[in-house]
A protein has these predicted regions:
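Metal-dependent nuclease catalytic cores in nucleic-acid-processing enzymes
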Residues: 132-147
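Metal-dependent nuclease catalytic cores that hydrolyze phosphodiester bonds in DNA/RNA
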Residues: 1-120
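Hydrophobic/aromatic pocket-lining and membrane-interface residues
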Residues: 114-116, 126, 142-145
Length: 147
């Protein structure tokens, strides 16, 4: 959840958080409005899972590059508008793979791990997760990016 062009933009993670706990959404909104600080809770287990997830994602990216795929990287530290335009330009140019594709649509924004061009020219979202089984939150996230 963040402000962009004077409005709140939500992400698939925000929707999943709301489905889990409405109060968490209120706290996230207060942080987005700069009404409170985000708690700096240290959680070594969560940090380990995040790091392992990043490694898994990096390994998949390296595999795509090793296969000779044309990979365009969208840097998620860019302005959202710039990142969304760069994603659209990469798709229009026919990039094989777009890494960290940025999508912004009205009240929503998100970054897909990978968007891969299919033989028919359409793009398919590919998300890298450490989980062995799909979870509803993952499916919701993929639906958002696929829409």
């Amino acid at each position: 959840m963040e402000f962009f062009n004077g409005a709140i933009l939500l992400s698939p993670s925000d929707l999943n958080a709301f489905l889990e706990c409405e109060h968490l959404t209120q706290l996230d909104l207060a942080v987005a409005r700069h009404e409170r600080e985000r708690p700096a809770a240290e959680n070594p287990q969560a940090e380990l899972v995040r790091r392992k997830g990043d490694e898994h994602e990096a390994a998949y990216l390296a595999e795509l590059i090793a296969k000779g795929r044309d990979v365009v990287t969208i840097h998620n530290d860019w302005d959202l508008g710039l990142a969304a335009r760069a994603t659209e330009e990469a798709m229009l140019a026919g990039a094989d793979v777009i890494y960290q594709a940025c999508f912004v649509d009205e009240d929503w924004r998100g970054f897909a791990d990978f968007v891969e061009r299919q033989p028919d020219g359409r793009y398919e979202v590919v998300d890298t997760k450490l989980a062995r089984h799909s979870k509803p939150a993952y499916v919701l996230q993929l639906c958002f990016y696929s829409e």
